[in-house]
Amino acid sequence: GSSYNAIGAMGNAQRWEANQVNPPDYFPLDQHSSTCAEDPYSISKWLGEHIGDAFARRNPQMALASMRFNGMWDDQYFEQLRGDPISDPWTRCQGFWTYVHIRDAARACVVAIADRTWQGHHRFFINAKDTMLAIPTMQALAAVYTDAPLNCELPDFASPISNQHVADIIG
């Protein structure tokens, strides 16, 4: 399995303060985002994805999914979030304020396994289309990731991690 840590999201900072956040190459993040992994856990996720690339080169008919889960929660935690959304953009900035319900994560795994129409190795970000922020995503990005280029404007509370690739490949 993989996670969004394959790009080095959480493991790079000793403490998440303004001068310690390593911004990604661009927003929204996607399957082509490079890594800035420095810690053993993130490096292991990144290496696992490269092993998937190698398997796919040798066996191009195989379907290999690196599922990049982010903030996977159950109903109880969702209720807490609804009651107290994040207003400080530095809170959970290392996870890019995204989340996924455990049922949706499980559904993505089942579909990836059951769907026989795709081949090769794919990196799939598995996350909701919105954030857990009480402020617009663009405002949070401007506060925390001031130097990261934007490939497009993100409306309202849109996730700064694109899940378009997973939608295109497995639905």
Regions found by a protein language model. Give the residues of each.
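Conserved beta-loop-beta element that borders a ligand/cofactor-binding pocket
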Residues: 2, 49-74
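Short, flexible, mixed-charge acidic loops at enzyme active sites
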Residues: 12-26, 78-87, 140-142
